[in-house]
Amino acid sequence: MLHRITYSLLLILFSFSSSFPQSIKKIVVGSNTFTETQILQWAQVTPSLSVYPGLTDSIKNRLAFNFSNRGYLNSNFDGIQIEPLSDSAFVNLTINFTEGEATYVKNIFIEREDSSLIDFNSYFDFLKGQIFNKYSLEESINEALTFAENNSYPFIKIKIEGIFLYDDSASGDHFADVHLLIDNGQKSTIDKIDVKGNTSTKDYVITRELRIEQGEEYSQTMIEELPKRLNRLRYFEPVATPQFLINTEKEGVLLIEVKEKQTNNFDGIIGYIPASKEGEKGYVTGLVNVSLRNLFGTGRAAAFHWQQFNRFSQDVEIKYLEPWLLGYPFNINGTLYQRKQDTTYVQRKLEGSLEYLATEDISAAVLVGTESIIPSQNANSYTRIFNSSILTTGVNLKIDTRDDPYAPKGGVLFINSYSLSRKKIIGPQEFITPDLETNINLQRFTFSFWGFYELFTNQVIAVGVTGKELRGSFFEESDLFKLGGNNSLRGYREEQFLGSRVAWSNLEYRFLLTRRSYAFAFFDTGYYLRNADEERNILKSEDFNIGYGIGLSIETGLGVLAVSFALAKGDSFSDGKIHFGIINEF
């Protein structure tokens, strides 16, 4: 009885120990042509891998597959074996093999089902005399397909009819003859454009943005660019790549499907601030934005902005856009702007510009504007705001290759402008002295660059750099550039700093939640310089600041709402600022 129990226990222990698989402790690889890293990657084995029945056969099959794809069709894998160790839990794996002689491409025969002027030989001739490599052949076929698709043949087919393998009877070398069958398909032109889904926008507004002439030859690269052109209109949800088909009349039809979004928006808030002391009147404060970006579906746009900051400061702005003047690629823009700044001055501007749409990515504009600065009767000698009139002329260059205006995954936005303002001071008389220069020329230089790059899926790096400089013999406060806030240096108040020279940079890491909504972390830097003005008791001010934080940009019916929490240099968490902004481009 005791012997039977002992025997049963030994049997159980043996079964229990054998249930644990052995693991690979060391892998020895021998190779002449390929690296050890390549062999291990193709064999899909690593140290600590558990040994299973058929492991060596799996390694042989995987290596044979990868070797043959790279032209080594005569390999021998008899040297793959598993060696047990004294420690029964581990084994060593030895991978020895013979690659054999490579197989070389001898001939490439191309058969055509129809005739065309496209010469495909140049895409395959260079393969002759090379090692027969599956991936090189596929790459050549893809290049030939791409070339044909961009040259009027979207329905081309290239088929590998066969590969004939043989050995040279004299030298014993291995060769392969490749037989290809090419069917060009119908040569295609874009004869019609069919737009679907546009309930408000006119067809001609969409087709003119495409810049496709009737009968233009088909190009796949151009077709893939069309969504970017339509997205810039900001009338639609992200547009998909158009489809191309041949109708019963053998005409090429480009089918574009769009989904319209809200383009006419109103948002605002109105409040009333009661009097804080006897004898004082209350006042209305608030913000109103009206944006009509596609009037009657014609692409015309108008906007109205009103904001009452406090009792004495107010902004009013009216804009209008007339696109594609008389059917030509020229846009006319007009702006009427008025700002009341505290109790110091009233600024009024009337500007107009003519923009030439040179290509779908590049535009240039000339602008002219008039401006007047009217000092308030309450202004004192310390502020010394002059009554002046300004005539401004300028030029602007814009390059925009972004794939989407709201949440781009790639592309750049570059804007460079120059303007010359002729300023004439006409009062108040008590401030005008004999040595005061009353005719002043002011030059403004502006540079802005944004670059976007998708590092990983739905993760985008955005980098922006902006610089502005004002040159002239004499500056007033209304002439200076403003820095700080949601659109420049976050972590600081809106327009907190003034300077004749300002610059800032923005670095954002964005994670896309939807196509046009994303969360982001940011790091901003900003610099400003305002030179001293001894006559007005203004000291020189110059500083470099940083801001950083996190934010969220969400697409809404009113536009894209950007909300961020930012900290300035030296701020504690409780000192952080929350910035709100609606990106609703005019």
Predicted ranges, named:
Residues 36-38, 117-119, 201-205, 374-376, ...:
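Short acidic/His/Gly/Ser-rich catalytic and metal-binding motifs that mark active-site loops
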Residues 48, 104-107, 188-191, 265-268, ...:
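Short small-residue beta-strand/loop micro-motif enriched in glycine and branched aliphatics
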Residues 5-17:
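Sec-dependent N-terminal signal peptides
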Residues 210, 282-291, 303-308, 312-313, ...:
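C-terminal transmembrane beta-barrel domains of outer membrane proteins
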Residues 165-166, 373, 390, 528-529:
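Short, active-site-adjacent cap segments at secondary-structure transitions
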Residues 2, 20-276, 283, 289, ...:
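Periplasmic polypeptide-binding modules associated with outer-membrane biogenesis and secretion
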Residues 117, 219-415, 483, 498-502, ...:
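Gram-negative/organellar outer-membrane beta-barrel architecture
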